[in-house]
Amino acid sequence: MTAPSATAFSSATTQPTTEGNASMRKRTIPVVPSVPERKWDPKAPKHIQEQPWTMQNWWRHLNWLHCMLIFGLPMIAIYGVFTTPLQTKTLIFAIIYYAYSGLGITAGYHRLWSHRAYKAKKPLEYFLAAGGAAAFEGSIRWWSRDHRAHHRYTDTDKDPYNVKKGFWYAHVGWMIILQNPRRIGRSDVSDLNSDPFVMFNHRHFLPIASFMAFIFPSLFCGLLWGDYRGGYFYAGVCRLVFVHHATFCVNSLAHLIGSQPFDDTNSARNHFITALVTLGEGNHNYHHAFPNDYRNGLRWYEYDPTKIFIYIASLFGLAYNLNTFPDNEIQKGIVQQKQKVLDRWRAKLNWGIPLEQLPVMEFEDFLEQSKTRPLVLINGVVHDMTGFEHPGGQGLLRSAFGKDATAAFNGGVYDHTNGAHNLLSTYRVAVVRGGMEVEVWKSGAGAQLPMKDTQGQKIVRVGEQITRIQPPIEAAAAN
């Protein structure tokens, strides 16, 4: 499963939050740990993945244990479905066991051990480790090591499940193909190496996982209602196939489909369908932006049963130090992303030639050219009104040719609308020297230039058009 972020797995400094129980919740500010890179030795024997695929060595490129799990389990499941009647009790237990094993991954392997998003008492650790073993996705240490590398090197060749290599590679390919340990990005797992329970799980994972994934569901269904075979095929094998591919969807779908409301510097996305099948891991863009937050979303209606489970566990004292990212920083991310979207939209629109790119025209030249061209001067900017049809009549427009119409345009005759100012900007052709001097705008000297968007373009908001005068000039009253 992936939990993406360019900031990668991070240790964190914490601050008490005013939200909820301060003794249980902490705000975290991630700090990327300093982890030395592996040094590549060009004289070292080539890994199989550094050698071309041939008819003689193709089998050496594959991870056969993973191949048996990924391809063998679905075939066993299909055989079981066609040869074993499904009992209602077994179906109910299989669904519950699916949720339990999924929770072992999401609340345990992922948020507890990979990201240290909260701390857990030993009973909760044992409970989650057993559920994670039932998912048969590797030991706590192995899973967390790859996941931390994924966060640190998201979307690069050092990312173990790099989605840039395609959907199928991110989904299952990275497990089918034997990984080159010299090419996978390094991650810091010293905290896991010093945890006796995690290392016990790592050393004895295969027998523990075999029991939890296959033997326990068979015994449970068999001893309670005599359905050993159904317990094995449905609560064991079929459940495991669904758990695996639900988890794999976080590596693949959650990096390809969905929204990016918090950060778009990497491929992580929020995807509701993935959240449904993974107990809340589908809010992946949030997770990659704020990886040490025990939540995968802010709002109550964002589907994240893992968050609810952790919170309830904290009420019973089984979980504590629940990390939450400062809300102010989360809101900043939202605003910045929305600004990016607006900037991309703005970049598609015609805002007229930027003032600094306009030529400088002498006032005498403006007067001379106005004899043959429909030029209008407003606030020091020359506009060529060729082809424009004035809604108030062409007579009003012609009366402004060759003149400074600043006052008339800004309330002297009519206080033109925001749309009129925007439209006028598309007709500008020069700025004048003399008269209303605005050459200074071209260099910015002595003037406060408008803010720029992320594309480097000036942001022109309502009422900030260069042709608008504040406050508008009052029209002359009739005597």
Curated annotation (Swiss-Prot):
Residue ranges, compositional bias (Low complexity): 1-18
Motif (Histidine box-2): 147-151
UniProt-listed GO biological process terms: unsaturated fatty acid biosynthetic process
SMART domains: Cyt-b5
PROSITE patterns for this protein: CYTOCHROME_B5_2 (PS50255), FATTY_ACID_DESATUR_1 (PS00476)
Cytoplasmic side: 1-61, 111-204, 251-479
Region spans: Disordered: 1-28
Record-listed heme binding positions: H390, H416
Keywords: Electron transport, Fatty acid biosynthesis, Fatty acid metabolism, Heme, Iron, Lipid biosynthesis, Lipid metabolism, Membrane, Metal-binding, Oxidoreductase, Transmembrane, Transmembrane helix, Transport
GO cellular component, one term: endoplasmic reticulum membrane
Residues spanned by motif Histidine box-1: 110-115
Motif (Histidine box-3): 284-288
Regions crossing the membrane: 62-82, 90-110, 205-225, 230-250
Cofactor binding note of this UniProt entry: Expected to bind 2 Fe(2+) ions per subunit.
Residues holding Fe cation 2: H150, H255, H284, H288
Gene Ontology MF: a single term: stearoyl-CoA 9-desaturase activity
Domain free text: The histidine box domains are involved in binding the catalytic metal ions.
Protein name, UniProt field: Probable acyl-CoA desaturase
